Amino acid sequence: MHFLFLLFSFFTFLPINDKGLCNLNNTAFNAGEKISYTIYYNVIGLYVNAGKTDFTVQSTSFNDNDAFTFTAIGKSNSKYDWIFKVRDRYESVVDAKTLLPYQFTRQINEGSFHKKEMVKFNQKARTASTEEEVYKTSECTFDVVSAIYAARNFNYSNLAINDKIYLNFFLDKSLYPSYFKYLGREVITTKYGKFEVIKLAPLLLKGSMFEGGEKMTIWVTDDENHIPVRIETPIVVGSIKVDMVGYQNIRYPLSSLIELVNN
C-alpha cells in the first residue's frame, strides 16, 4: 500500500454528481494554495505520527491552454525512516476551466519499492495513455489528484442524508466508477481547531490494506473552500487518521473554523 495512497484512497472514491462536474467552474481554490496534513497510525490505542503530506496549486499552461498543476508530496516521519523510508510525489496538470486532467505523473519511493508513471488523458477521445498502452475511459475521467480538487467544487447544499454522488477515475491501468455518501453536517475538533464540517463516507474498493465498503469517514469544511480537515478509517491492522495542520493562500476566509486548538 503506497504511502500517499492512504490519503488518496478517500479522495479517489470521492465521486461526483452525474449532473455536475463535466461542466464545473472552479470556485474553491486559487493558484498559490498550500494545504498540509499529518498522517497518524493507531495500532494499540495510541496514535503515532507516521508522516506528512503537502498539497499545492500552481498556475501553468499546457499546449497553450490555461492550466493548473496540482502537486502532492508525501514523506514518512524521519524518526521512522530507518524502518521504512517514504518519499512520494504525485502531480496532475489539469484544464483551468474544467479541472479535467491533461497529464498525471507519480514517483513512488517506499522502502525498496520504486515506481515512476505518466498517464496522458485525451478527454475528447476518452482515452488514457501510458508508455505501454492506450486505455478507454469515459466522459469526465479524473486521476486521483484532480479528483480531490474537483470534489471541492461540488455544491453540497442540496443533498439529503444518504444521497450518493458518482465519479469515474483512472488509476493503475483501470477505470473505476464509485460513489460517496453524504452524511450531513456537524462540528468536530481536530489537531488544528474546531470546525463546522460536512461529513462524507466514500465507498472503498477492497484491497490489501482496506476492507472495502463505507467504513472511511471524511470531514470537509462547511464553507466555500471545502477543505478536507480530517479523514479516519480502519485498516487491516489498526486505523489511520489524517488531520489538516496548516494552510496558505486559500481562496476564502476559513469561516467554518470556530476556534483554534492550543497546541
Regions found by a protein language model. Give the residues of each.
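Sec-dependent N-terminal signal peptides
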Residues: 3-12
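Acidic, serine/threonine-rich low-complexity disordered tracts
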Residues: 16-121, 159-263
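Hydrophobic, well-structured mid-protein blocks that either form specific transmembrane helices
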Residues: 113-156
